[in-house]
């Protein structure tokens, strides 16, 4: 298994034209993995607390989420430091292209998490019904927060695309 990962990584790096683009791509995948894992842990703690409030204390929820956030932000700062260093070697066009790709992947990842969380809540509601108003409030809160985050990502994406078009015209 490890040899497969190493070989695929080497092939990936060899295929990349620019060494710095290869480094950025690998760092981007690491950042996405950290963010995805953290979101999954946080959402699973929240969903577990929603359906089993008697089995978990509020202190445990807070401690779990804060631990994840401390780990997440520490690792993200570390990885973004590498990203900043590698971005300094690229042209402006390549920088915006990288940011565009990164934004698309984050958008799709967060959308997947939102749909998975909502489907888990709906499936649990079918099996073990909670009061209807609680169910509607849970789904509504998740939906509103997802819509806000998605609008922010779309705005970011549109800004990056405008910059890319401006650079292409020059």
Swiss-Prot record:
The keyword Transmembrane applies. Coiled coil: none annotated. InterPro entries: DUF5418. GO terms for cellular component: plasma membrane. Keywords: Cell membrane, Membrane, Transmembrane, Transmembrane helix. The chain crosses the membrane at residues 31-51, 58-78, 133-153. To M.jannaschii MJ0554 and MJ0587. This is Uncharacterized protein MJ0129.
